[in-house]
Amino acid sequence: MQKGTLIEFWLHGHRHLAVVDRPKDNKHWIVVDHLNQAHTINPRQITYTIGPGYTTAEIPAFQAAVATQLDPDSLEVAWEILVEEGRSVDPAAMSTLLFADTEPVNCYAAHCLLSEDKLYFKQKGDVYEPRSVSQVADLKHQATIAQQRQQEWETLLSRLQQALAQPGSVDWQASDRPRLEALERYATFKEEANPRDATQAQEVLAALQRPETPEAAFDLLVALGLWQPHENLFLRRSQIPVQFPPTVLAMATSRLDAPPADADRDRVDLTHLKVYTIDDISTLEIDDGLSWEVLPDGREQLWIHIADPTRWVSPGDELDLEARRRSTTLYLPTGMIPMFPPEIATGPMSLNQGQVCCALSFGVILTPAGAVDAYTIVPSRIRPTYRLTYEDVDEMLELGVQAEPEIAAIARWGMVRSQWRQSQGAIAIHMPEASIKVQDDEVTIQLLDNSLARQLVAEMMILAGEVAARYGQAHNLPLPFRNQPQPELPPETELLQLPPGPVRYSAIRRCMPRSEVSLSPARHASLGLDTYAQVTSPIRRYSDLLAHFQIKAHLRGETPPFSAEQLQEVLMSVSAAAQEAVWVERQTNRYWGLEFLRRHATDLWQGLVLRWLREHESLALVLLEELGLELAMRFDRPVALGEQLTLRVAYVDPRNDVIHLREVDTPTVTDLPKVEQLA
């Protein structure tokens, strides 16, 4: 190259013009820019040669002249001509087309236009080839989309800043949802989030100068007012729907406005019976009631009335399929997520006091020992007389209210029935149970005791389940029978060495196998029954609803709606959904239990050593007796099963499921590993 040649090269991502001064060695040249700054370059770095005869002082004027010619719109006109001709051009040819000459300024301007263009031309060697009409159309479309996305991104950031400054002041747009949902999924699934979601969420966090972590995403969603500080991540990780689809709500409304014809027109009128419904005060879905009467022959008959949602639901309709998808009503400390829309579940489906209700009634006569002597199952009409709480019934039984001999008779038969089941090998486990409620951000824990009222209701429900299973077995009816294999319990001598109460029950509980659902009747070990089927919660447990469909069809003399094969298929999907619901309930209760302890960090609790988790590591399961919470604790001293302790929370983090307990009289605070609650 000659001294004085004006060339273009790139430095730090920008064009630079410089004049060739001299060679530095065999491979490099020294060039000088308009600031008289020297640069050492390799000839391969030169991207355009303008020509000889220039000095560095002329560079600014040359650049100014070029700038006046840089009109990108002119390229479109040139492209239209060249694409029609199918001709490629170099900068000189483009200069001729655009400016009608090949002056250095215009040639360089043409070079700049062509090299910066990403739409109309594609470089191939030293020439530029016009793109096809379809290619240009596609690129324009892509550019429009990119511009729109950039605008949406900038608008989203603006709205995010506004929402952070004034929570609740922003009306989020549809275009915001993908980024916000990615942020939610990143906060929910953490390291397991989809990589695309993680990337989008991290871009938002980085733009707002926040840590690019799932925890920061959670905090941002709370700060934006989109999430609550105690957002239920377990529920969000599940497939459990929170809202009902419009079609399901529409059908519920339709059934309320125009009830369908009753398939059981010949319901038995049992409205003369006094019916007690017994539930917690917060219960809204009332699905069982109890009666007692003396027959003309002097025998006593118990009635267990179960709500009849099949009066309002048919197999395969929208309400049924949605209930099947949900599988169960979910009971969380913060409220319930029902299996059916609330307006119909707590309305005509429920056994509401004073109203004539449709039911499936189980009439049972027991032997003096408590075995089933005779039974009848009938679709019925009843009128619940009293809605009682467990506390109401306990008080009535304690005071011996003379005006309610029926409730006393039911309680008496409940005790007889319990003793009979014990004689049949039933295994009773009475562990303290915590009922955790959250109302207006206040967390309360109530310890549920095994009162007479709860025992009598449980016995009557078990009795109805035995009768339903007997009916199904007698008529070879496909039903979701529930069974439990016989456990291998520790030897009696070993159990007697353990302190009675929770410690001993905990040892027995650990040996109990899971109950199973099968189409074949089999023994249920812990209930002490040869056959059993759950039928007493059809509003809130789909497998119970299935049993109602089957039994009621058979009572009418019809073919059951589900064959054995169909029932098995439905039960498989329902069981998976029900297991997920149990997991969400357990984890949510665990979270709020830890949150309660966090808020009472200075309180002292009476603890009981239940059993060893890993004795060689001094890791045990302890029961906080006032709360019914079971937690892991590592000891730095020898302890015995059944030993009572005074405990305090040393550290708790509900969101990360970590709690450290310490003995008040022991100065050493032991760091505890994260251990899942064992229940």
Task: Label every PLM stretch briefly.
Residues 2-6, 10-16, 25-27, 35-37, ...:
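Electropositive polyanion-binding surfaces
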Residues 50-61:
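Compositionally biased alpha-helical segments
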Residues 108-113, 126-130:
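Major-groove recognition helix of helix-turn-helix-like DNA-binding domains
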Residues 115-127, 227:
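A short, conserved structural fragment
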Residues 124-140, 236:
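Accessory beta->alpha helical hairpin/"wing" motif in late/C-terminal subdomains of nucleic-acid enzymes
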Residues 136-161:
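Short, amphipathic alpha-helical interaction segments positioned at domain boundaries
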Residues 168-272:
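Low-complexity, highly charged intrinsically disordered N-terminal segments
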